[in-house]
Amino acid sequence: MKVAAEAARRFLLARHLLAPARSVAGGLDGVLEVFRTFGSIQFDPIAVAGRNHDLVLHARVAGYEPAWCDVLYERREIFETTNKALSLVPASDFPWFRLGIGRKGPRFHAAILAENAVVAERVLGRIRAEGALSA
């Protein structure tokens, strides 16, 4: 099967909800539609040019407002978890992540911190002194 480059471009832009621009209806339902379509959106709380999830949603949801994600958090319709990287995920997908979250519980994180206590303290010290840092 041969697909023309232009057809492939149109397909990929539509599949990633980028064509036409901001074609997803505005509001909380539109934001949830993007989360459900993608499964997750990488989350980066540090805003160099803007927080990643806000940039992703702004490009796809008409009139996107960052406060909409806060509302979805409060309503427990999205949550943070690790999905290769820290990500925001629709709460409806929680059952798929539950086992992995359980495996990486408090003992898992305590063991990592114990093994890397010197480095962890150095990083925390810099954050206390300088504020948020990029990776």
Predicted regions and their residues:
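Phosphate-backbone binding and catalysis cores of DNA-processing enzymes
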Residues: 1-133
